[in-house]
Structures are given as structure tokens and as C-alpha cells.
Amino acid sequence: MIFERKKYLDELIAGRGNGLVKIITGIRRCGKSFLLFDIWHNWLLEHGVTDNHIIEIQLDDFRNRRLRKPDALLDYIDSKVVDDGNPYYIVLDEVQLVEEFVDVILSLTHMRNVDVYVSGSNSRFLSSDVVTEFRGRGDEIRIWPLTFDEYFNGIGGDIRKAWLDYYTFGGLPQVALLETEEKKTDYLRGLYETTYLRDVIERNHLRNPEGMKELVRVLASGIGSSTNPTRIAHTFQSSQGVTIKRDTIKQYIDYLKDSFLIEEALRYDVKGRKYIGTETKYYFADIGIRAAILNYRQQEETHIMENIIYNELRSRGYNVDVGLVELGGKDENGKFVRRQLEVDFVVNRPPYRVYIQSAFHMPTPEKEQQERRPLLSINDHFRKIVIVGDDIHRKEDELGVLTIGLLDFLTDKKLLEQG
């Protein structure tokens, strides 16, 4: 079973020889090492690069422990690079294990005819500001867990069964390779407890690990719901009698974002063209991890579908906000009132903008009108889409609103770029 990761291969090809360090980031176990040591390695060989011009070092291998010293690593690479006019490709995995690794990598950029690629899964490397540390010499390539299209193309078979597995266990490549539901469940639970959660707690020297664990559960329980640190603090107080300060919760959320475990979707006033800072929504980078955190309770189809759509949009390279549309009008008593309608996703990647509603079912004309109303209240020329969980034929009405089935959307990579 092979997962091609063509999008990321294309990004590596586009950045080849650009003079920047290619920094492969993303949640742990999402396939960064496989991308570099298998997919990228094979592509280089197929395109004329000889094996002795590919220098690969897995720094978590105990046999390479001496190379974790800066001088030893630089001396080793120097011994392998011969100025024969052909470029060398230096690939370093778990690079954060090297002492002063930022300065070491910057030293490599001063060498002639070298192209440098680094990845890592430790929290030191996973920090979201790692690219900044490279002082403008880094080119970040963000890796996501498998999209549904990547997952289905890898495993094949019946698309509905593939969807049920993906919906339940997410898109981490190793999970897809496990044969039974029990193995998948055990793997995800162990990965969360011993890797993701421990990494965040140890890196940030948290004195209240139980508070962090409970916060993650609260966020997992509320995916797709607007919230803020103040509201979460009230939830702790009312449901558990536990006091955690708003600023502490905000800091904990930042730690989770830095580890790529969650992402934040900001609220955007579509007509006012400004961000509204009162509340945000949070989504998990992998829906299988979210399920494991909640012990596979709360498998609500509407929220899981929304999280998967969010991840799909982000993996395609779009910025994603939650849209608000304010309308004014008279109520039944003739009094002028203002109402706010929500657009699930305002999707941006210049020159494209798309407004998207996620609706698991639209069984009645009233429900369909409810989902379309926020989109029709936006008076601009950008595309407007309703994604439904049912298998339907896509249709575009006279007002330009496209309705499309979920699996159709997830497997059509060019849809958002069409006029």
C-alpha cells in the first residue's frame, strides 16, 4: 500500500535548488520522514541524481549519535561533498537532536552546490516559529495527515467503506496500514497519550498536566463550536469546580497550536471586512486523534464532517476563517433588529475566495433555505458552495450556489479553482 503524497512532492520539486532550507513541518506521524527518505529520494534517483549525491542522516538512529555534535555533523557532511559541479542533497531527520541545530543548518547554506532538507518530530522542532529561527532562509512545507482522496487512492476498494474507516480513524498513514479496528484504536490512544500530550507537557514544563489533558478533551468535545478562553474557564468551573485562569487556558491553547495538534479558525465579518476577536473555532489536525481523546464517544457526524472539510481546505493551501454576515430588518413587531448569520468557511488563497456551508443533511426545503441564506446574503462575485453529506449529483442553481456531495468535494482537487 503506497500513499503518493503528490502535492508535497510537487512542492519539493518546485523548491529544488532555490537556495533555501526546505523545512518539513507538521503533526507527528503524518509522514514527513517517508516523504523525504522514500518519495523524494526515489524521485531524485529517477531524475539523474546519483546515490552518492544524496546525503541522508537519521539523527534518532543510535548509530548516528556522534553526529548530534555540531562539529562532527559538519565534518561528516564536508567529507561527503566533493566540488564536482553537481548538486548534493542533504536530508536531515530529527534535526532538533543536533546541538545548536539552527546554526548548524545555516552553516550548510554557505556551502556551494548543496540543497538542504530538514524535518523533525520533537516539540523543539515542531514549534510554529521554527521557520523564523532560520532568519529568512527557510522554506516551510507543511505536511498534513492523509486527505480522504490520498487515503482512498492508497487503499482502494469500496469508497463508502473507505469513508467510514477514514471518518472513524482519521488519516495518519500508520493507522491506515493497520488491519483491525482494535489495532487502530490502540495505536491512536497510545500515540496521543505517549507522544502528542507528553510532548506538549514536557516541552512547556507544565505544572498542571491534568488541566492540559482536560482542556484537550473540552476542545475535542466542542469542535466546530465558537468559544474563547473565558468561556472555557467557566466550563471548568461549572462542570468540575476547577479554577483555571483565562490567561492560563489561552497559553495552553497556544501550546497545542504550536504542536500542530489543533488549529484556530478566526471569525470574519464578511461585509465589514474585518476580524472579530470575541470567539473562535478549533479543529483537530487529525480526526482519529480527536476520537481517541474522547474514547470514541461523541461521534457526531455533523461536527466530524465539518472538521474534515476544514482540514481538507487547509491541506489544499487555503486560509480558512468562519464568516459572519450581519443583516438588518424589521421583526414581527415592526422593530428594526440586526441579525448575524454564519458562513461555516470563508476560504482564501489569492486570487481565489470561496464561501462554503457544511450541511450533513438537507431533508426539507426549509433546511436547504436555511443553509443557503447566509451565502445569498453576500453580495459579491465569489463562488458559493453547500457541501452535503449525502451522495448527490452536483447542481448549481440560477443564483450561482453550487450544491455538492461530500465525497465528490473531497476527491475533486480543482473544484475551488474553477470559475
Pin down the residues of each PLM region.
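Interdomain hinge/linker elements that couple catalytic modules in large macromolecular machines
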Residues: 2, 149-326
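A cross-kingdom feature that marks ATP-driven nucleic-acid transaction machinery
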Residues: 2, 34, 45, 49, ...
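Pre-Walker A adenine-sensing motif
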Residues: 2-19
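Hydrophobic anchor at the beta1->P-loop junction of P-loop NTPases
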Residues: 24
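Conserved catalytic segments around the Walker B and adjacent sensor/switch elements
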Residues: 45-61
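Short glycine-rich substrate-engagement loop in P-loop NTPases that contacts/grips substrate
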Residues: 56-86
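Structural recognition of the conserved hydrophobic beta-strand(s) that form the central parallel beta-sheet
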Residues: 115-121, 142
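Short regulatory helix/loop adjacent to the ATP-binding pocket of P-loop NTPases
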Residues: 124-139, 154-156
